[in-house]
Amino acid sequence: MWPAPTAAPVEEPTRPTVQAVLCVSDHPNPPGAARCRICSDVIAAQPARDVPLPVLALLRASNGHVAEVDRPVLIGRSPSPDRSDAADPELLTVTSPSHDISRTHLEVAPSGWDLVLTDLHSTNGTVLVTPDGKTRQLDPGEAVVVPLGTAIELADGVSVLVDYPQ
């Protein structure tokens, strides 16, 4: 009898790492942080260490859909993973009754501890509303770092909030 064939091991994609300091509840935070970004506890002085990239934000679409940002997230009315350089991007589908939102409208991706939003040459553009209420129209293809609390206005009355992780 021949031995049964074995399947080739499936390689899990490796998650990127970041330098971090941990609070007493082991939440990862950017080096130099005084308080935890999750629980607000004081962070004791400590050397930074490499940790897997944590969830940096939650994207809350006005249709109720939510995506975690721990890898690139493509947002649109029918987002296609082909529009990202990432091996396995998250897809966040939003409604667009008038088809004013592009199929793959924009990408929100982690870059270290930053969140980089890129308009993917959308037809009707992307408007950002920062936490202090300032608005900014992105140019097609423009990439910007966005803070937590930013609202992303797409079209058709659809918006996405860049919210704090839980």
Sequence positions of predicted segments:
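Intrinsically disordered, low-complexity acidic Ser/Thr-rich regulatory segments
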Residues: 1-97, 147-148, 158-166
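Forkhead-associated
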Residues: 71-148, 155, 163
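Short polybasic amphipathic segments
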Residues: 55-60, 125-128, 152
